[in-house]
């Protein structure tokens, strides 16, 4: 590997910052995917709702929550103060996890609305995580690493979901809550370390 671009202290400092901050952004958004995407590993064979495939309805419902959150986020994120970002992230992941537990315990069709709240809780996370890295001299590199998380994490969340169902015999309804719970523990343990 050629590191000739690191010619002086400032370049080296930028390189280290890109690895540290970009890696933190990548891992943070990857944990968001652990709360958002594992249900896509489930097939929900034989289930339908309102004459449509159950998984399609669940996916559309979650996307609608996510879409609404994007519109709310336009105002919310622009006004969110730096000292409140971590609280916002923690609140959003707890709400998203509670929605996944609701998805597991509520009977159909009520449980699909839990996925709406899951999407609603997570829809602003990209913007909040990006707010930590924007305005830097190397924002473009940091944003690239954040973007990579979408490519990697979607498949990883689905693979983890399949593993949990196949090897631990967790149901299709409880699997997202189990994986999301693990992500919550990672988020909150890191937040506790920062105090």
Regions found by a protein language model. Give the residues of each.
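Pair of pore-lining "gating" transmembrane helices in MFS-fold secondary transporters
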Residues: 14-35
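Central cavity-lining transmembrane alpha-helices of secondary-active solute carriers
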Residues: 60-75
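C-terminal ends and interior cores of transmembrane alpha-helices
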Residues: 94-106
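Hydrophobic core of transmembrane alpha-helices in multi-pass small-molecule transporters
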Residues: 110-124
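Intracellular juxtamembrane helix-capping segments at the cytosolic ends
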Residues: 124-135
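Glycine-rich segments within core transmembrane alpha-helices of 12-TM secondary carriers
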Residues: 142-161
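Helix-loop-helix hairpin linking two adjacent transmembrane segments in secondary transporters
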Residues: 157-186
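Conserved small/polar residues in nucleotide/adenosyl-binding loops
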Residues: 187-194
